[in-house]
Amino acid sequence: MKVKTRFAPSPTGFLHVGGARTALYSWLHAKSKGGEFVLRIEDTDIARSTQEAVDAILEGMTWMGLTWDEGPYYQTKRFDRYKEIIAKMLSDGTAYKCYCTKERVNELREAQEKAGESPRYDSKCRGLAPQNTDAPYVIRFKNPKEGSVKFDDHVRGPIEFSNTELDDLIIQRTDGTPTYNFCVVVDDWDMGITYVVRGEDHINNTPRQINILKALGAPLPEYAHVAMILGDDGAKLSKRHGAVSVMQFRDEGYLPEALKNYLVRLGWSHGDQEIFSEKEMIELFSLDAINKAPSAFNTEKLLWLNQHYIKSLDPAYIAQHLAWHMTNQKIDMTNGPALPEIVSALSERAKTLVELATTSRYFFEEYEDFDATAAKKHLRPVAEDALVLVKQKLQTSDDWTDPALHQIINDTANELGVGMGKVGMPLRVAITGGGQSPSLDVTLRLIGKERSIKRIDRALEFIAARVAAS
């Protein structure tokens, strides 16, 4: 039988990291078994579902590279199918109409809670003969009264629920719309889902869904319920811990490879290995190796992974992601070197693409002012001779390559009888406006001859003004 998994988010908000990890695990299991991955939008909560949330989910999935083989399917477009199944269940006697009012159900629940009992419907209408009435009703599933529901969870091991703990679940509301637990069952059956990977908050839904599947004569999928993700303080991960939306991580300069690598390790491991390519994830991933204990989100670890991928992936690929951040920071990419060259020059130090874009600004536009600390230390009168001489050599050079530029700086230092730093640091501040940059030969090459000469002139004017003011 072909393995088929699904990710089935509700479009009531963004794609958060917990959902993204569940989607990743489900996607990896399908890919590792040569199977298919289905995307299903569970939008039966019409009041809370929005198109904006659907778009955010699709955008997050696409950005992470979690491509789906089928879908996206929408539950609201399948209402006729749900009604067809409910009609059959009524006919087969596995479901019934319940005319109990909300007031009666509420009173029953309050009485049970006062008695220290778990609230559940008492099946008053279960054996009722068909009624000739216009009174509003819900439709309930006839849950078995005896026995138990057992299933082997790939994460948590054997789980068992007594049927006496389960009441007769509402599968259709008074307005005729089907309920979540029922729609999920029909969808998984119709779509041939063989593995259900989801959060541990769905464990209590599982026995109810299994009983409905059995009543329909449908095959049962296998289940894997993954633990929640916690913040670094041990509380459930939320906005107060920082970014929780997948696209917020994009906005903060993370690569999809870094987030994917981090999330796969947040509850799953393969020995001591930390870095996983997508190919390795697919080859090595196993549902049975997922840890059933909650995992704590560690931003520093994610940053470390992000820096690793910025340094190690193809600069041309990094540049594709960097372009979004350059545009976001209103940096004109047409007014400077090609982005892959910027990535090659700056990737060694950058932890995020936001940082990389910010530090690249002087390659594309004039800096407003010199960094005060760097200028005070390095743009002093004593630096004037070095800047004048290196400017002359740069102006007359026809070779604007890294080795030639390095030689010019070296020759300037030798002629003046000073160390390389006495030439290099004033030149760096002149060219970039600050005290940090890639190697000077690379920086000069990327900024270009004309722009570099103008910036040295600007630094010389700064020194002259400093002398005049003293």
Curated annotation (Swiss-Prot):
| NCBIfam families recorded | gltX_bact
Listed under GO biological process in this entry are:
glutamyl-tRNA aminoacylation
| Record family assignment | Belongs to the class-I aminoacyl-tRNA synthetase family. Glutamate--tRNA ligase type 1 subfamily.
| Motif residue range(s): 'KMSKS' region | 236-240
Q: Which reaction does it catalyse?
A: tRNA(Glu) + L-glutamate + ATP = L-glutamyl-tRNA(Glu) + AMP + diphosphate
Q: GO cellular component terms?
A: cytosol
- Subcellular locations according to the entry: Cytoplasm
- The name under which this protein is listed is Glutamate--tRNA ligase
What CDD domains does the database record attribute to this sequence? GluRS_core
Q: Which InterPro entries match?
A: aa-tRNA-synth_I_cd-bd (IPR045462), aa-tRNA-synth_I_codon-bd_sub2 (IPR020751), aa-tRNA-synth_I_CS (IPR001412), aa_tRNA-synth_I_cd-bd_sf (IPR008925), Glu-tRNA-ligase_bac/mito (IPR004527), Glu/Gln-tRNA-synth (IPR000924), Glu/Gln-tRNA-synth_Ib_cat-dom (IPR020058), GluQ/Sye (IPR049940)
Q: GO MF terms on file? A: ATP binding; glutamate-tRNA ligase activity; tRNA binding; zinc ion binding
Subunit structure, briefly?
Monomer.
Q: Where does ATP bind?
A: 239
Q: Kindly give the Pfam families that the UniProt entry links to this protein.
A: Anticodon_2, tRNA-synt_1c
Q: What is its EC number?
A: 6.1.1.17
**Free-text function comment from the UniProt entry:** Catalyzes the attachment of glutamate to tRNA(Glu) in a two-step reaction: glutamate is first activated by ATP to form Glu-AMP and then transferred to the acceptor end of tRNA(Glu).
Please name the HAMAP family in this protein's record: Glu_tRNA_synth_type1
List where the motif 'HIGH' region lies. 9-19
- Kindly state which keywords UniProt assigns to this record, in alphabetical order: Aminoacyl-tRNA synthetase, ATP-binding, Cytoplasm, Ligase, Nucleotide-binding, Protein biosynthesis
